[in-house]
């Protein structure tokens, strides 16, 4: 079974250490999201993002890494930049995550990015926070865009997440009717009220699989951020060892969905 982690901030550990950590838990490949982003401000105030770390990781370990591109929603050249995403080795998608400043999301300020993503076939990872109405409006308007809901759509108040396990999943399921929406099953153990292996969470995962189909769900660890709550191994093995999931479910959730949705073919 190929295991793909669809979000890691590998720049926080470095390339060699990231490879060692992946090997230790049994992860074959990972999608890098450089965080914090390396920004370059142009004279006109527009921000561009530097991918030197990810480019080096992909060049050195093309079978192990891909990465996420980011764009300034006000960049007048975003269409041209988006057109280059799929041409760059290892660059598979973009991400809308506003650093927990959701004003631009509420105001619909990502129209230019989403229009370009739809035009050029670039999947868009998006973290709704508590702005599900705004994200749903995007999903409806930009139906040619492949959206991926980050962090199972959980709210921003991490301390109260276990209180909202069922309601978080209920909210997530409202996206299932939109065929252009997939889900990143990341940070999910934070929702559990139980210790590893988080059986209450796995029961909720079964609901998500029934609603979306497992071919629209991909696992992510985000382990540099979730280390305050659970380990990298716990994030993975609560799924690998889950009796409620079939082997086919695990294959899709842990690898095949990421390959298919991100259009990231397995290297020969």
Regions found by a protein language model. Give the residues of each.
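Active-site metal-binding loops of divalent metal-dependent hydrolases
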Residues: 8, 98, 152, 221-223
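N-terminal cationic-hydrophobic initiation segments that often serve targeting/anchoring roles
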Residues: 22, 58-62, 86, 139-140, ...
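Catalytic pocket-lining loop regions of alpha/beta-barrel enzymes
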Residues: 91, 103-218, 266
């Amino acid at each position: 079974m190929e295991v793909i982690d669809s979000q890691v901030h590998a720049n926080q550990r470095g390339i060699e250490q990231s490879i060692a950590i992946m090997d230790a838990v049994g992860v074959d490949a990972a999608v890098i999201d450089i965080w914090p982003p390396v920004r370059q401000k142009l004279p006109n105030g527009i921000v561009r993002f530097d991918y030197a770390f990810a480019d080096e990781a992909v060049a050195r370990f093309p079978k192990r890494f891909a990465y996420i591109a980011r764009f300034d929603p006000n960049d007048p050249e975003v269409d041209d930049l988006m057109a280059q995403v799929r041409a760059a080795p290892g660059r598979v998608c973009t991400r809308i995550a506003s650093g927990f400043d959701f004003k631009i999301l509420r105001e619909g300020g990502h129209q230019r990015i989403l229009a370009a993503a739809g035009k050029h076939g670039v999947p868009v990872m998006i973290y709704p926070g508590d702005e599900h109405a705004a994200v749903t409006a995007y999903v409806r308007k930009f139906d040619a865009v492949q959206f991926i809901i980050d962090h199972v759509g959980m709210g921003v108040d991490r301390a109260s997440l276990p209180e909202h396990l069922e309601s978080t999943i209920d909210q997530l399921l409202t996206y299932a009717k939109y065929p252009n929406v997939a889900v990143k099953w990341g940070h999910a153990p934070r929702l559990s009220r139980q210790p590893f292996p988080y059986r209450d969470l796995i029961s909720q995962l079964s609901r998500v699989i029934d609603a979306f189909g497992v071919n629209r769900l991909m696992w992510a660890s985000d382990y540099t951020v979730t280390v305050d709550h659970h380990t990298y191994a716990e994030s993975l093995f609560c799924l690998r060892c889950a009796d409620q999931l079939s082997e086919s479910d695990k294959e899709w959730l842990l690898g095949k969905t990421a390959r298919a949705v991100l259009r990231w073919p397995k290297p020969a």
